[in-house]
A protein has these predicted regions:
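Short, well-structured alpha-helical segments in soluble
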Residues: 67-80
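Sec/Tat signal peptide C-region and signal peptidase I cleavage site
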Residues: 16-22
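Periplasmic-binding protein-like
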Residues: 81-89, 106-110
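Extracytoplasmic "Venus flytrap"
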Residues: 25-50, 59-66, 89-91
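Bacterial N-terminal signal peptides that target proteins for export
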Residues: 1-9
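Short beta-strand elements at the ligand-binding edges of bilobed clamshell
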Residues: 116-126
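Hydrophobic alpha-helical
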Residues: 87-101
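Short glycine-enriched loops at secondary-structure junctions
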Residues: 64, 111-114
Length: 126
């Protein structure tokens, strides 16, 4: 759990340093939902801290199955997220497909380190 927390700290530091004017965080939860007592719940708690301590808006998406991830990621981006956090390696393909379509949005792909990044807007935390 400590390793996952460290990944978040590093990821958010990288993103904050290049997106000083960002004000909406979007979180796409992996299977298990945001209260899974593990990976997703850490993402939820971190996003809540960003919301409460930095004043950012929070946009969330919980897919019922993996086929909804890309659609949900697009919805979060279309709702104005300036930072999208994709939780888990199952979301790698969706990040790779969606991020180039939104070059002004930063994406953090947690537990992913093999995605091509032609737009330069994917931070891979693995």
């Amino acid at each position: 759990m400590k390793k996952i927390f460290n990944i978040f700290v590093v990821s958010f530091t990288l993103v904050f340093s290049s997106s000083l004017f960002a004000n909406k965080i979007g979180v796409i939860y992996d299977s298990g939902g945001k209260f899974d007592k593990s990976f997703n719940e850490l993402a939820y708690n971190t996003a809540e801290r960003v919301k409460n301590e930095l004043g950012w808006d929070l946009i969330e998406f919980e897919a019922a199955n993996n086929t909804q991830i890309e659609q949900g990621m697009r919805k979060v981006a279309d709702r104005g997220a300036t930072l999208v956090v994709a939780m888990g390696f199952a979301q790698a393909d969706a990040v790779a497909a969606i991020a180039p379509q939104y070059p002004n949005i930063n994406f953090v792909a947690v537990d992913v380190c093999w995605v091509d990044d032609p737009a330069g807007n994917i931070y891979q935390a693995c």
